[in-house]
Amino acid sequence: MLITKIVGHIDDYESSDKKVDWLEVEWEDLNKRILRKETENGTDIAIKLENSGTLRYGDVLYESDDTLIAIRTKLEKVYVIKPQTMQEMGKMAFEIGNRHTMCIIEDDEILVRYDKTLEKLIDEVGVSYEQSERRFKEPFKYRGHQH
């Protein structure tokens, strides 16, 4: 099945009794306009978005009378970092950026992929954190630069 545009968002179908056939992708795949994968139920999907937009968790790619095909990211081990002050946020953001570690800020939390070497760094900064499993909902926005 060829998909050239997003037809909606899963939140718009909360009251619907349509079945959702998830197309599970890697976090990095959200930045891609062209992608080929199979849904959980085995439907072959070829995505070739016409515009230059990105995919997002919950995007509905296809709708029939009884089924939706929607995007979701894989469940990943993450550190949920919870700065309590602006100083903690600044220190942690500096350290994460200095390592070129991808992160997402959601509400008052910083989410980074699990990496055992980060534990020591987070402990040194003194910020509270926990290990958890989450799905990244936003594509990482790359900002290219040179040193």
Curated annotation (Swiss-Prot):
GO process terms (BP): protein folding; protein-containing complex assembly; urea metabolic process
Main location, first listed in the record: cytoplasm
Cofactor note: Binds 1 Zn(2+) or 1 Ni(2+) ion per dimer or tetramer.
Subcellular location per the Swiss-Prot or TrEMBL entry: Cytoplasm
Keywords: Chaperone, Cytoplasm, Metal-binding, Nickel, Nickel insertion, Zinc
Keyword Methyltransferase: no
Coiled-coil spans in chain: none
Covalent S-S links between cysteines: none
Record-linked InterPro entries: UreE, UreE_C_dom, UreE_N, UreE_N_sf
CC per GO annotation: cytoplasm
Single Gene Ontology MF annotation: nickel cation binding
Sites where the protein binds Ni(2+): 100
Cofactor dependence: Zn(2+); Ni(2+)
Family from the record: Belongs to the UreE family.
Function in brief: Involved in urease metallocenter assembly. Binds nickel. Probably functions as a nickel donor during metallocenter assembly.
UniProt subunit comment: Homodimer in diluted solutions, homotetramer in concentrated solutions and when bound to Ni(2+) or Zn(2+). The homodimer is thought to be the active form.
Protein name in the entry: Urease accessory protein UreE
Origin species: Sporosarcina pasteurii
Gene designation per UniProt: ureE
